[in-house]
């Protein structure tokens, strides 16, 4: 019984670390590598992990084989949390953290949000929209218009995502709002190039991280995860395109 308890705690640490990385935008290979390194550092020499965007399976070999499953229902992007889990993992590998302290630090990390306030997110999205306008050869005279539309669009997405749990529909409705606002701005003479205004305003919604992770997982041989993330990115892009097309069909 004395040998079993540390193994149970180690498995909890591995699963919690993997869950935090996967939930906050980490790659599949990083999750598997982190879990295996933690297990090895705490004396589990042979362990196996299977990770997909919606779940983690972790198993150990030996006299008492143990298999655990954790389901991932929500995913976001918080690279600070990923970095903090990596720091904890490195301390574990160096022998600087006992199992109890590591588990407590991971639980504290799970309970804290470490997110910017929504005002900062909206301002960042608005600034990014304006910069993308210039990057795509837009006019400086449209910068303020795109700044406002991009900010309003991202704020609408945050609010709609609370009301509509399905992210696809929230993105679709947000794209409609952005398309309608852009068309209205051009109609009122507040903007010049409709296409550049729309492109700049929707860029904060584009799933760049999902596309990057999908390609990275496919290149690493994680076909299930790569295709899943690629499909999620495709649905997001389709929702944005469908929303804009809906508005332009009436323009």
Question: Where do the PLM segments sit?
Answer:
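Generic secondary-structure signature for well-ordered alpha-helical cores
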Residues: 23, 27, 40, 44, ...
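Cytosolic regulatory modules rich in charged/polar residues
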Residues: 29, 101-118, 168-169, 197-200, ...
């Amino acid at each position: 019984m004395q040998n079993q308890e540390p193994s149970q705690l180690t498995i909890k640490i591995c699963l919690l670390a993997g869950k935090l990385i996967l939930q906050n935008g980490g790659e599949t290979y990083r999750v598997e590598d982190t879990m295996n390194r933690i297990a090895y550092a705490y004396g589990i020499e042979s362990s196996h992990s299977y990770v997909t965007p919606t779940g983690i399976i972790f198993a150990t070999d030996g006299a008492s084989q143990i298999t655990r499953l954790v389901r991932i229902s929500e995913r976001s992007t918080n690279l600070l949390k990923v970095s903090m889990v990596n720091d904890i993992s490195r301390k574990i590998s160096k022998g600087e953290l006992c199992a109890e302290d590591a588990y407590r630090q991971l639980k504290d990390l799970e309970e804290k949000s470490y997110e910017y306030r929504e005002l900062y997110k909206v301002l960042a999205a608005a600034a990014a929209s304006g910069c993308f306008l210039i990057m795509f050869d837009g006019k400086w005279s449209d910068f303020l218009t795109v700044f406002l539309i991009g900010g309003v669009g991202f704020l609408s997405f945050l609010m709609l995502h609370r009301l509509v749990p399905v992210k696809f529909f929230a993105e679709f409705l947000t794209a409609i709002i952005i398309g309608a606002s852009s068309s209205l701005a051009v109609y009122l003479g507040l903007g010049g190039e409709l296409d550049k205004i729309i492109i700049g305003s929707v860029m904060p919604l584009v799933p760049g991280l999902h596309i990057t992770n999908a390609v990275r997982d496919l290149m690493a041989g994680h076909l299930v995860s790569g295709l899943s993330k690629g499909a999620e990115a495709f649905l997001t892009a389709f929702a944005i395109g469908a929303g804009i097309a809906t508005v332009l069909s009436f323009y």
